[in-house]
C-alpha cells in the first residue's frame, strides 16, 4: 500500500501537456511491486524503464502501457521511493524512431521502441534498445534534436545505474553500468540547442566543468523548469540556487549521475539544489536529468 509521503514532499502529481506526461513526488510504503496507475491520457505506447531514486540506491521503475507504475528491482530501502523524473511522450504523441548504429535495434516484446520527439523546443527520448555489437555508440539524433553541450544522463540498467552520454553531434553513448546488454532511453530529455538557456547560479565553490561540457543552465519551457550540465567541486551539500520562476511547490528528489554511481539531489521550494546521498566521487556531478 503506497501513499504520498506528505510533509515537505507534498503529493504525487502528474501533468499532461502537448502529449508529454510527467510524474513528480515521493511515495511511502513497503510492498515493492505495483505502486500507482496513471490515467488514460498519461500512458506510454509500450513499457518504459525509468531510473528512480531510493536515497543512496537506484531503483528500476517501469511504466506500462496500461498506466501501471511498477517497482521492479534495485533499491527498496527506507520505506520510500521518488517518482520524480518520469517523463515520456504519451500514446497520442508524435514520435520518430531513433536512427541506430552498430547493429542496435528495438528490444521488442512489450517495450516501447526507441524514439525521439521534439515538442516545444524540448527533445524527449524513450524506449528500449536491444541487439548491437558491443560498441557503446547505440544511436544518433538528427541535427534538429541535439544539445548545445555534452550531457550525461543517469538511466536504468536493471539493478544498476548507467551513464548515458548525449553528444553535441547527436551521438548517444552508453558509458558505465553495462550490467545488461540493453539500454533504456526513458527519462532522457533536454532543451534543443536553440532553446533559451540561462546560466545557473552555483554555490559552495562548485563551478561549471567547462570546455565541451560547458556551463550548467536552466530552461523554462511552458512551465517546466529543466536544469542541466556538468559541475566540478568537492563540497557535497548545497550546490546551486534557482530563481523564483524556476522553483517547485514541494521538495523533489532527483536521481543524477556520478559516473558509475547514482546521486540523490534534492530541489527545495526556495530554489536551493542540494546533494544529499549516494555517489560523491570523481570531483564532479551531472545535474542533467
Per-range role (PLM):
Residues 20-27, 122-129, 223-231:
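Short, well-ordered beta-strand segments enriched in hydrophobic/aromatic residues
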